[in-house]
């Protein structure tokens, strides 16, 4: 029996989709640049028309990832941060990449406040002022670009232009995409009204393959995937985020292999400690703004998974990344003004160099942060002097 990848949205899901597309999202400018108030349905429509006008072939526009999952199962407590939009386009060469970037930056001018003088605002100026992240990938398997628009609360509007992408999901619960073109056409009709008797047919697809199976995983908050060896390094960070938000492995007998794959891939893609730190900090910034204790729980969960399932590192590399995660977690506690209780912390002390010639060493305490032992998957909660835990 073949898998069914598609389904039509119900009336309630279409209403949720309409609310998401009609919500005003602020795009914050750097420095003295003003904040733009943008509705997703407007910018998606304008960008699509601009690309077509510039000769770019646009197959469709879709909502992707956590926002699509939210629309399908918002009643299950599913939430989202970023609003990910995928434009299916043809990008045969570098020239088309440049056309896409310039078209998007030009569209942003339309959303500036009316009193702003736009004549001297070049694409480069708009990029520096409003783009948080600009990515271009073109290799044997993947050909896509990403323009992420800045939002200080972490609710970034991410526009992704995909010509080819070997893998478009990490886990079944984030494999959903919702085709937006019927809604865009509906919005273009000024006389159309969204009613239960008359609403557009909107299709959702699971890139995982079996839509109903993926939907069951989403409804029951289960972690499952296919071909884990294809998951890139960021999959480890997403996996730990799912754990922190109440998701559980669908199959406990397979989860250790999955964790080992993800840990190995993370350290292959980010081999140096500086890269690892940058990647983790970026993930925290994008997904945990204003969520201090959740951020702390996330770091402790990441610590547990790395500690239990990393098999590809030398001993000193392993200690290095675990120490980094621990220090990041303690920094979060410091920002929350929560002081750790050290009564149950095991400390190991290094004897001073001038005792090296002695056969027996006395124990001295030196002012260095001691190693801290954490249990995997069960984040520690230090009890502070202010009563918080």
From Swiss-Prot:
Catalytic function, reaction form: RNA(n) + ATP = RNA(n)-3'-adenine ribonucleotide + diphosphate
Record carries keyword Iron: no
Expressed in which tissues: restricted to testis.
Effect annotated for changing residue 136 to P: Decrease about 50% the poly(A) elongation activity
A single GO BP: mRNA stabilization
Annotated InterPro entries: TET5 (IPR012937)
Family membership noted in the UniProt record: Belongs to the TENT family.
Function text: Catalyzes the transfer of one adenosine molecule from an ATP to an mRNA poly(A) tail bearing a 3'-OH terminal group.
Protein's UniProt name: Terminal nucleotidyltransferase 5D
